[in-house]
A protein has these predicted regions:
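Positively charged, low-complexity/disordered segments
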Residues: 1-7, 171-174, 178
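Membrane-embedded alpha-helical bundles of multi-pass enzymes
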Residues: 8-172
Length: 178
């Protein structure tokens, strides 16, 4: 990320991460789900470990900053905090949650460096599931923005897939389709 375009690169990664929010309710542009992970893969496939960490971190920051905007409202309206404090706390949470994407995709990069192409296409979805699993079970228990949720309300799968198993039964197949 060095050079004069470093700030521009950061914004591009954040923008890409924020676009995936469009796949969720209330927007429900679920086809975005098939485009954005593929673009993230294209961004990190030729990068080194350090750049992969930063690319996936800023991607995650865009995802979380736009995906959990409602928390700021909860903090200010129901918690009585100032809007500045509510915004700061929400961005702080987004910064923390972004670490899960960064760790998972950096692990993907470490594992995939000596793999064949068909193995990489299985490892990338596994890294996405790992980021959701780490967030859910090991650290925060924050069940928000599972990519598998985008498949629940689309016309193809509506009513067929239970929500409680979203990340295992929806996230992996969704990312595999990319």
């Amino acid at each position: 990320l060095a050079g004069s375009s470093a700030a521009s690169d950061v914004y591009k990664r954040q923008f890409l991460g924020s676009l995936i929010v469009l796949a969720f309710q209330p927007f429900n542009y679920w086809l975005v789900t098939f485009l954005i992970p593929g673009l993230l893969y294209q961004l990190i496939k030729t990068e080194g470990i350090k750049n992969t960490f930063f690319i996936s971190y800023f991607f995650g920051f865009g995802l979380w900053a736009f995906g959990i905007f409602w928390i700021e409202n909860s903090i200010t309206v129901y918690g009585g905090a100032s809007p500045i404090l509510g915004s700061f706390l929400t961005l702080l949470l987004a910064a923390f949650l972004s670490l899960f994407q960064a760790i998972s995709f950096t692990a993907f990069k470490l594992v995939s460096s000596q793999r064949k192409t068909h193995e990489i296409f299985l490892l990338f979805p596994a890294a996405w599931v790992l980021s959701e699993w780490l967030r859910e079970f090991l650290f925060t228990g924050f069940p928000w923005l599972y990519i598998g949720y985008t498949a629940v309300d689309n016309s193809l799968l509506q009513g067929y897939i239970p929500i409680p198993v979203s990340y295992t039964h929806l996230t992996l197949p969704t990312i595999l389709l990319v």
